[in-house]
Design a protein with these regions (language model features):
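Charge-rich, N-proximal long alpha-helical rod segments
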Residues: 1-10
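Structured alpha/beta interaction-core segments
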Residues: 12-102, 106-109
């Protein structure tokens, strides 16, 4: 039963990933009306999934934590502290306090 539950949550995460991908694409074309609407949709979804204790891991601007983050790159950035997350490639998620997918991040050197 628990394995099926995690499969369902991972499918929800895949949907959120697709929304993020569309958001990034629309943002590249400066389509603020579309990105604003996507932000509203994602905010609603986050509220709903929060009620079932599926939480997006806060990453951008935070410091790298190997328990919840997966470092996929390191870049020089003099405006950030060492090991501070400067970019999130893929959001991570926790279910009831347990990581079901770490956030893939790029950190400052």
């Amino acid at each position: 039963k628990k394995l099926n539950e995690i499969k369902i949550y991972k499918k929800i995460i895949n949907i959120l990933d697709q929304i993020d991908n569309v958001y990034k694409f629309a943002d590249e074309f400066n389509n603020s009306e579309f990105t604003d609407n996507l932000s509203i949709i994602k905010k609603i979804i986050r509220k709903e999934i929060g009620e079932i204790e599926l939480i997006e891991i806060k990453s951008l601007g935070e410091f790298f934590n190997p328990e919840v983050h997966k470092c996929i790159g390191v870049e020089k950035d003099r405006t950030k502290e060492k090991d501070q997350i400067i970019s999130v490639i893929e959001n991570g998620y926790m279910l009831r306090g347990k990581v079901i997918r770490p956030a893939s991040v790029i950190i400052a050197r």
